[in-house]
Amino acid sequence: MTIAATEALTRCIEHREIFHDEMLHLMRLLMRGELSPQIASALLMGLRVKKETVGEITAAAQVMREFATPVVTPNPQDLLDMCGTGGDGSHTFNISTTAMFVAAAAGVPIAKHGNRSASSSSGSADVLEALGANLQLTPEEVAECVAATGIGFMFAPAHHGAMKNVAAVRKELGVRTIFNILGPLTNPAGAANQLMGVFHPDLVGIQVRVLERLGSRHVLVVHGKDGMDEASLGAATMVGELKDGVVREYEIHPEDYGLSMMSNRGIKVSNREESRALVIEALDNVDGVARDIVALNAGLAIYAGNKADSIPEALALAFETISNGSARAKLEEFCAYTRKFQK
């Protein structure tokens, strides 16, 4: 065991924060596979039991970004990511993935970071493939997609190869660790703007402050009070916002924007084909909960992407983009463009 690991474990046992430089060092050891499985497991569980701090998560995210395979674009400060933690257990269709087509059609350049299903019925990569997208793209091809269509999708395993060094430990543990909240913090394109859904209310304030330290521009971190890692129509939504260097926390309610409170029962799915059907239904402007929850989340994305000065203005733009067909057209454009790169 390294001296740094011994000190870190002692700090976890005593519920004290691991110093920033120590956390950087330990994460580099983890990402290089230089800690034994026993020490890696002890460290991950120690952090979880102690509860990871903003400083520790920030350091861990910085190291994951160091090890990531980047996507280079001319203006990362304009890009928006829409990547949630997942793990909310709601089994709803892919709301944020659908909303990205609406936001992109409204002029927000999207660099979405996503993966296959871990705990849900359909991950973002799963449903995009069901919709006809090719996700086996090089970083250069992703950047070309962003330039040509306004959307790039970065399949997480292709950009975070070092994660293979902790995969066995995570699988053996079988419980959430710090890595479950690092994914949305490690966008390979360096997107400065973000709409992030989180599975636990405590993460709203934590993640927005981590992104503040990481230098983000405009961020909304959301948690539906019915447990969703999205803005919800079934309950109020907690929001942590970073804008102009200032963090605010507040709640939004569907009724504030003229939306009806609706149950999420009608948007639960059990596989990617059911999710695909609801994506199409929402983008085809079929009246109902699928369309409205997509519009709500797309509105927040448009606001976070700085294409509207307020949430009400952004929500109106989201509904307009759905109703005039441009969001559905954006889906078709993106999928067709990615297929150009099929080997």
From Swiss-Prot:
Pfam families: Glycos_trans_3N (PF02885), Glycos_transf_3 (PF00591). GO terms for biological process: L-tryptophan biosynthetic process. Pathway: Amino-acid biosynthesis; L-tryptophan biosynthesis; L-tryptophan from chorismate: step 2/5. Mg(2+) 2 binds at D229, E230. Anthranilate 2 binds at R170. It catalyses: N-(5-phospho-beta-D-ribosyl)anthranilate + diphosphate = 5-phospho-alpha-D-ribose 1-diphosphate + anthranilate. Its EC number is 2.4.2.18. InterPro entries: Anthranilate_Pribosyl_Tfrase, Glycosyl_Trfase_fam3, Glycosyl_Trfase_fam3_N_dom, Glycosyl_Trfase_fam3_N_dom_sf, Nuc_phospho_transferase. Keywords: Amino-acid biosynthesis, Aromatic amino acid biosynthesis, Glycosyltransferase, Magnesium, Metal-binding, Transferase, Tryptophan biosynthesis. GO terms for cellular component: cytosol. 5-phospho-alpha-D-ribose 1-diphosphate binds at residues 84, 87-88, 92, 94-97, 112-120, 124. Its cofactor is Mg(2+). One of its GO terms (molecular function) is magnesium ion binding. Binds 2 magnesium ions per monomer. The keyword Amino-acid biosynthesis applies. Anthranilate 1 binds at G84, N115. Mg(2+) 1 binds at S96, E230. The keyword Nucleus does not apply. Catalyzes the transfer of the phosphoribosyl group of 5-phosphorylribose-1-pyrophosphate (PRPP) to anthranilate to yield N-(5'-phosphoribosyl)-anthranilate (PRA). HAMAP family: TrpD. Homodimer. Belongs to the anthranilate phosphoribosyltransferase family. This is Anthranilate phosphoribosyltransferase. It comes from Bordetella pertussis (strain Tohama I / ATCC BAA-589 / NCTC 13251). The lineage of its organism: Bacteria, Pseudomonadati, Pseudomonadota, Betaproteobacteria, Burkholderiales.
